[in-house]
Amino acid sequence: VEPVHINYRGYDVWEMPPNGHGITALMALNILKGFDFDGRDSVATLHKQIEAMKLAFADGMQYIADPRYMRTKVEAMLSEEYAAERRALIGEQALLPEAGKPFCGGTVYLCTADNEGNMVSFIQSNYKDFGSGVVLPGYGINFNDRGAGFSLDESSDDFLLPRKKPYHTIIPGFLTKDGEAVGPFGVMGAYMQPQGHVQVLMNTIDFLLNPQAALDAPRWQWIDGREVWLEDRFAPEVIEQLRKLGHDVRV
């Protein structure tokens, strides 16, 4: 497939296209690049990151489908004009966007590189538990159950049809700058993946952390509505101030 990308502060961020949800990470970054940030774990930074991710997911859950059936085009979703429109919605209080309810997954991500400059960003998941439970006779290959990503709402671009690809969450990423490879990136966890991409990339680009530190930094995850999960490594005062901004924070 042909990956989709945006430019974020001089870096080209590459993600898997629809029917995967890598585009939600790109939409969030497109919104966030219009802000200045005062620190990695500050209340203002976390609030803006969470709100941008919520807006991106609201669009993603509405529009992502098999690209042959998408009535809203990727180019429109990633346009600077649309990012500015969505950015203007972010205020001092937590939003309540319309979006589907995320749920947990079981995914493996790995990346590798060699001394010749070859790099691989790889992810694998059968989706729920053991996937479909259907195994290829004689080979032991277990088929996935990604068909669960279809919508049964006939008005949805992601409505279930024969020979159609469902919305899915498998999105290995890649980062380049000025046409040169910087490196692969990715995280695990279904709907956490684009949220993790945004946080790891901002840790690297905005806050100048090395790759290990960018991955090790504490993370948040938007769940649904105003509910946000934060790792307990965030400062207690940051957690309390986010609650005052209207976020339903669970630690």
Segments predicted by a language model, with ranges:
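Glycine-rich phosphate/pyrophosphate-binding beta-alpha loops
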Residues: W14-G22, V108-C111, I123-V134, V187-Q193
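Short glycine-rich loop/turn motifs
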Residues: E2-P3, A25, G105-L110, M119, ...
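Active-site rim segments in enzyme catalytic domains, especially the processed small/beta chain
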Residues: N118-G183, F207, P211
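Long, well-ordered, tryptophan-enriched scaffold segments
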Residues: V1-V13, P17-P18
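Internal maturation/activation junctions in enzymes
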Residues: F35-N126, G138-Y139, R146
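Alpha-helical support elements that line or immediately flank enzyme active sites
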Residues: V187-L209
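Extended C-terminal subregions enriched in glycine
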Residues: L46, E116, K164, H197, ...
